[in-house]
A protein has these predicted regions:
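Catalytic, metal-anchored helix/loop core of enzyme active sites in primary metabolism
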Residues: 1-175
Length: 175
């Protein structure tokens, strides 16, 4: 296999700089206040807990037929980089774009072509100052990510059970 590892990126959501004590005081209102993305309530909560990133890792494992140890995620607060692929020869490719949900949707709809969405695209010249800083996800601070990774590793019915449990947990949290 040419792919050695892939990383998805997460902004870290509203709690990326929280401590364990801060996390004990989280409310639905705080969780729904995402610093970058504008989304519906369910996906915003999943983004705040990084459950969405864990689920996306499972999706990547299934879509690209990769073992769980070859798929991970990192926090990238600027949301300029959306994924990286490390190849067996040591080279890496990275997808850069603005934080606009229309871009991945348009790419999926138009595949293998691309739609001209320059106004929402990445208007960031190569000579500008880039901030491509990344940090590991704290699995203690974001247990949903760790649980999703484990469900992906176990495979079978575990990912489906995870999705159902997440639906119920988010619904209960928002009450």
């Amino acid at each position: 296999n040419e792919v050695k590892k892939i990383w998805l990126t997460a902004s870290g959501g509203p709690f990326r700089n929280y401590s364990e004590d801060d996390m004990k005081k989280v409310t639905p209102e705080l969780a729904l206040n995402h610093p970058i993305w504008k989304m519906g309530a369910k996906i915003t909560i999943d983004s705040a807990t990084l459950m969405n990133k864990g689920i996306e890792c499972i999706e990547a494992m299934r879509l690209f037929n990769l073992q769980s140890e070859k798929v991970d995620a990192v926090i990238h607060p600027k949301s300029q980089a959306h994924g990286m692929v490390l190849f067996c020869d040591g080279t890496m490719k990275m997808l850069l774009s603005s934080a606009d949900m229309r871009l991945p949707s348009a790419a999926a709809i138009a595949w293998p072509n691309r739609l001209p969405l320059i106004e929402s695209g990445f208007n960031f010249p190569p000579t500008a100052e880039w901030d491509l800083s990344f940090k590991k996800i704290d699995r203690k601070l974001f247990p949903c990510f760790r649980i999703a990774q484990e469900a992906g590793r176990l495979a079978g019915a575990y990912p489906s059970l995870l999705i159902g449990a997440d639906e119920a947990a988010v619904k209960n949290f928002l009450k």
